[in-house]
Amino acid sequence: SIPCGESCVWIPCTITALAGCKCKSKVCYN
């Protein structure tokens, strides 16, 4: 998995989610 540079502790992945990133361990991964 590659970190997308966005956290998802309080809110879900937003901008990076459009690039296919999903929340994993409080960080958005691709």
Curated annotation (Swiss-Prot):
InterPro entries: Cyclotide, Cyclotide_bracelet_CS, Cyclotide_sf
BP-aspect Gene Ontology terms: defense response
Domain of life: Eukaryota
Presence of the UniProt keyword NADP in the record: no
Pfam families: Cyclotide (PF03784)
Modification note: This is a cyclic peptide.
Keyword terms, alphabetized: Disulfide bond, Knottin, Plant defense
Cross-link type Cyclopeptide (Ser-Asn), residue numbers: 1-30
Disulfide bridge partners, by residue number: 4-21, 8-23, 13-28
Family label: Belongs to the cyclotide family. Bracelet subfamily.
Notes concerning its domains: The presence of a 'disulfide through disulfide knot' structurally defines this protein as a knottin.
Role of this protein: Probably participates in a plant defense mechanism.
Protein name: Cycloviolacin-O7
Source organism (scientific name): Viola odorata
